[in-house]
Amino acid sequence: MPKIIEAIYENGVFKPLQKVDLKEGERVRIKLEKVEEVVDEVFGILKGKDTLKALRELEEWGFC
């Protein structure tokens, strides 16, 4: 089942911001979406607001 996690890209490597349940060397597919762009696109009403905070709240409420 697909799982969405946040990651940061540093020095050519994607680093997850939370623990992932993977074995060392396991291959995965990554779909890149900038968090801010997703929130602004779907929730245009939030333009100019703290989109990262809004997305985290939506995830907590089970909408994402």
UniProtKB/Swiss-Prot annotation:
Where do the coiled-coil regions begin and end? Answer: none
Which Pfam families would you find in this protein's record? AF2212-like
- Has UniProt tagged this entry with the keyword Transmembrane helix? no
Q: Which UniProt keywords apply?
A: Toxin-antitoxin system
Source species, domain of life = Archaea
| Family the UniProt entry places it in | Belongs to the UPF0165 family.
Give a short account of what the protein does: Possibly the antitoxin component of a type II toxin-antitoxin (TA) system.
Protein's name according to its UniProt entry: Putative antitoxin AF_1074
What is the native source organism of this protein?
Archaeoglobus fulgidus (strain ATCC 49558 / DSM 4304 / JCM 9628 / NBRC 100126 / VC-16)
